[in-house]
Amino acid sequence: MLPVKPVWNKLESMARANLGGDFKPGAIEWETIVRAHERIRPRIHRTPVLTSATLDALAGAELFFKCENLQKTGSFKIRGATNAIFSLSEEDAARGVVTHSSGNHAAAVACAAGWRGIAAWIVMPKNAPAVKCRAVEAYGGKITFCEPTVASRAETAARVQQETGAVMVHPYDDDRIIAGQATAAKELLEDVPELDAVLAPVSGGGLLSGTCLGAKGQNGTVKVFGCEPERADDAYRSLTSGVLQKLESSDTIADGLRASLAPRTFAILRENVDGVLLVSEEEIVEATKRIWERMKVVVEPSGAVALAPLLRSSGVSKLRLRKNSEHAKPRIGIILSGGNVELKC
């Protein structure tokens, strides 16, 4: 087992990165999240919170799984995409939307655009899973493939936007996206108010930023941790150095976690996240198998990353949670972010 590598939030000792623009981490207020929830509620599922006695025993904690793998389009991404697209003015919506994504955000944007009756142009890396490409096409998205690098995705999306005149719906560097993603943690804390910590995967940072805001907006004492593959560790490096780091390429099995933090999400996380935990490829596979076998739900490797560090010996103790006199064991929420995986029989 590899040791947990937490990033403890000591902002006063961190160097300040050049974020650009006038964005402030407090720009997304609680009321913004509440309005986003009201906007998307009629169109999405309120996903269940499931438990597993077996996984509780393995982790030495009470685990509460927010099952976004059972969400429409198969991931949490529909929350942010729906909020962003239904926030557009009629004039902007008529132009259509463009985005880049390895799959789940792509499907979410295509789906939400279809609900609003507008066009969606989607840039995807050529190594994106076939199941995710088929989903985008089924929802009516128009796919342009690019090289599997962060730079190629951004450059290709900019070209498609210039050619089409469509509105960019960034996968994570967008207040509307982050506010939408925050509604998953909002629901989790409404259903299970007394949590000691919440763990969520981190890639571009939209979900983790939203989880920080959505959880801590209701419970100021809850800790929030990001979970990230060792082979895609830019969030860990960014938060330890205090300078935004880029992920040039990655070969992790967690294909949904191959993006880098953006200035906006970096700013939010630097102010709010309590740590980032790195996990190995073997640990990701093990967590995925445990969920499939014990909970009988389909989760993709990217979605299972948040369980992985808790299956290590002393994994929970590394979170440094305060003792709760009302509960014998720590109570930890886990965001299962998606379930879009291709089955080959």
Predicted feature descriptions by range:
Residues 6-345:
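PLP-dependent amino-acid enzyme catalytic core
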